From Swiss-Prot:
The lineage of its organism: Bacteria, Pseudomonadati, Pseudomonadota, Gammaproteobacteria, Enterobacterales. Its cofactor is pyridoxal 5'-phosphate. One of its GO terms (biological process) is L-histidine biosynthetic process. Disulfide bonds: none annotated. NCBIfam families: hisC. Pfam families: Aminotran_1_2. It comes from Buchnera aphidicola subsp. Baizongia pistaciae (strain Bp). Keywords: Amino-acid biosynthesis, Aminotransferase, Histidine biosynthesis, Pyridoxal phosphate, Transferase. Pathway: Amino-acid biosynthesis; L-histidine biosynthesis; L-histidine from 5-phospho-alpha-D-ribose 1-diphosphate: step 7/9. This is Histidinol-phosphate aminotransferase. Belongs to the class-II pyridoxal-phosphate-dependent aminotransferase family. Histidinol-phosphate aminotransferase subfamily. SUPFAM superfamilies: PLP-dependent transferases. The modification N6-(pyridoxal phosphate)lysine is found at K211. Its EC number is 2.6.1.9. Homodimer.
Length: 360
């Protein structure tokens, strides 16, 4: 039997997301997935697993609501932000009729989730400054139900101007939802727009424990919006989305003690990023290092294929961005421990000596 005859046409044509782990590599230093370099110290309490979990764990909802300073009715717990991205399309978009919009170069799952669900996606490239092209957005917004933007943006590391997000919210009121993915916001927490949920009924914010909380392996995220949107999404989400072990560890991570630990680690990592970038700025093999407020930064090399190959062969795994919109010769580097950063510097210095000799 030819199984392709049974598969939906749009799935046959789909180019799947390449996760950091699926790409492979025999790495000792993993700087390709924007994970926090230090593991969490949480451990499971004694829980029974013979009963199904709550649909939405009350303790976890209350803990996250307290952390953000909003009411729990405005929160939906999801299996990472990826489930929330897909859930919004399932709930609000009619296949082959409605559209979503996103702004490349950015996180690929906005586009891929739409394609899986047979919903048209419109990619409006960011400007050279990696900011929104509002004029082009407004000219192409007809039929768009969901607009996804990542802030700070992945892979560029910059913040989208708050006034531009507000302009989008105002222009699309009553027509579309603006979905702001704040996966990396703890690294620049003062720039969150969560509090705008009270003012704008078409705002949805996505958050996660995968990055600053050092819980990428847990798969726990949060969708924040007004209670009417939460109620609609609750009709569509799976009946038991959050397992008891996930709920337990996620709730523990939101205790005052563990939030203090997270904030302290974020402060240290931000200092490491500044130091790391400073070490790289004078290298001949580098064209540009783009400013970042997240736990990663984007580097444009003169020859990114050579750099990627050298790092790979030395078991340092980074993320090639050459196929992304307007990112030729670019590599995204996650900020690791100081020792991991030193290893990157050591390899790049060796490459740099070749460039110095050529320039002479």
């Amino acid at each position: 039997m030819d199984i392709k005859k049974l598969v939906r046409k749009n799935i046959l044509q789909l180019v799947p997301y390449q996760s950091a782990r699926s790409i492979g590599g025999n790495g000792d230093v993993w700087l390709n997935a924007n994970e926090f370099p230090i593991s969490s110290c949480l451990s499971l309490i004694n829980i029974s697993l013979n009963r199904y979990p709550e649909f939405q764990p009350k303790k976890l909802l209350n803990a996250y609501a307290f952390y953000l300073g909003i009411c729990s009715e405005k929160i939906l717990v999801t299996r990472g932000s990826d489930e929330a991205i897909e859930l919004l399309i399932k709930t609000f978009c009619e296949p082959r009729k409605d559209k979503i919009m996103y702004f490349p170069p950015t996180y690929d799952m906005y586009d891929i989730s739409a394609k899986i669900l047979n919903v048209e996606s419109i990619g409006i490239p960011l400007l050279k400054s990696f900011q929104l092209d509002l004029n082009l957005i407004f000219r192409n917004i007809c039929g768009v139900k969901l607009i996804y933007l990542c802030n700070p943006n992945n892979p560029t590391g910059n913040l989208i101007k708050k006034q531009d997000i507000i302009a989008l919210l105002t222009y699309t009121k009553g027509k579309a939802l603006i979905v702001v993915d704040e996966a990396y916001i703890e690294f620049c927490a003062m720039h969150s727009i969560v509090q705008l949920i009270e003012k704008y009924s078409n705002l949805v914010v996505l958050r996660t424990l995968s990055k600053a909380f050092s819980l990428a392996g847990l798969r726990c995220g949060f969708l924040l919006s007004n209670s009417n949107i939460i109620k609609m999404l609750s009709k569509v989400i799976n009946p038991y989305p959050i397992s008891l072990p996930v709920s337990d560890l996620a709730t523990q991570s939101l205790s005052k003690k563990n939030i203090d630990i997270m904030n302290s680690r974020v402060l240290d990592l931000n200092k490491t990023r500044v130091w790391f970038v400073k070490q790289l700025r004078t290298m001949y093999c580098i064209n540009t290092i783009f400013d970042s407020v997240a736990n990663y930064f984007l580097v444009k090399f003169h020859d990114s294929k050579l750099v990627f190959k050298e790092l790979w062969e030395n078991k340092v795994i980074v993320r090639d961005q050459n196929k992304k919109t307007n990112l030729k010769n670019c590599i995204r580097i996650s900020v690791g421990t100081r020792l991991e950063c030193f290893e990157v510097i050591r390899i790049l210095e060796r490459i740099d000596r070749l460039y110095k000799n050529v320039r002479r």
